Amino acid sequence: ETNEDNESFIEYIAGEKGIAEKWLKAGAFGYRLDVADELPDKFLDEFCKSVKSLNNDYVVIGEVWEDATNKISHGGRRKYLLGEQLDSVMNYPFASAILTFMRYGVAENFMESVVSICENYPKTALDCLMNHIGTHDTARILTSLIYDSIEHKPRNIQVDCKLTDVEYEKAKALLKCATVLQYTLPGFPSIYYGDEAGVQGGGDPFNRSFFPWGAEDSDITEWYQRLGKVRNSLKCLKNGSFKPYSAMLSCIAYTREREGEKIMVIANRNYHEIDYYLPDEFKYKEELIFGAQVTDFVKIPAHSAVIIKSN
């Protein structure tokens, strides 16, 4: 077992010509630290100092599953985001909020979880949160949207878990809605390989199958490409402000704004189409994903989301 407080170990990893420096000079642009809450502050201090001494733009992101501003481990409150350690963290709280909303449609709980992180995190950390909805530690997103906690089932159940055609189509609709949130909440979207191609699976090791070269779900792939283009066209999604607008009746809405550019994101988790009546600044404006007609309201299909730009 490694003692991360050991001076020689810290020197080996973070010292001059150490492991951190080696891979940065080889072309890496930063690090994601696995299970950062199991690393002591002394190690994190020296590691992050070493990385930043080479280039202040190099990024260090830690794997923290809870709110990183009040995480308790190693016998005390951690100082990840106080300015001398991590730049940001993997955003498991947002992932949990998105998945739970997609499964159960409780809008109020979703917004409460998101607002809590937005209020607690420094703006610099908030803007570079690693927003994922699937990782090597979780069940595949398509499977997880239909089967809650599948990764905790016996392996003989997980190995045979494959969505029916009806379940798959429902999961795809929920995935598309979920990814709109993933791509528009504060932070940057991170995609676990294969999610953009329709890969299914339970927990480890069933979430680590080969990429389906030649058998990708082109509809899902094209959806991710479309969202990527929308995101890249909007500066307000890089580091704009976030404001909740509404959260009720299985529907959520929020705005992002920066330097005069403003969008409203509306997600409908209901099993039916809704008419969402808009504030004045978004009436008769442009819907960016589908080109949906916008008057003083917008029609949003079941399990779907829209992005409306005010100007």
Predicted regions and their residues:
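Short, solvent-exposed loop/turn segments at secondary-structure junctions
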Residues: L24, F29, D37-P40, W65-A68, ...
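Carbohydrate-interacting/catalytic domains
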Residues: G76, A171-K172, T184-I191, A197-N311
